[in-house]
Amino acid sequence: APPMSSAMANVDLKRLDRAFAARVAAYPPFASQRNFGACALELCYTAAGYFDLYLHGGQKPWDYAAGSLILAEAGGNLCGFEHDDYWTSPAWHRSVIAALDPVLFAQWRDWVRENRKK
C-alpha cells in the first residue's frame, strides 16, 4: 500500500460538517483530493484503483447502492462515521469511509474518526 501521505482521495467536502471539512482541507493526510459529484461513479473509481481513499458525509440509497456493492465485490473496505458494519448503517443518510487497500482503509478510517471529534 502506498503511504496515506501520497494517496489520491475523493472527498465531498460540502457533505461534511463545516469544522471537519475545514480540517480536511487545511491539514489533509493525503496528497491530492478530487470530487466528481456522482457517488456511484466515485465508489466505482475507488474499486478500480483510480482513488486510494473515499469520504462522503451522507449519501442517499440511490447514491451508494450500486457503487458500494461494486467496491465490496472488488475487495474494498467500507464503513460509516459511527458504524464499522457499513451495511447496517442508517440506510437513508449513510456516511462512507472507504478504500480498496485494507491497510490504507484502516489508516483513513482512524484518521477520519479521530479528526471528526476535534
Segment roles from a protein language model:
Residues 1-118:
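An extended, acidic
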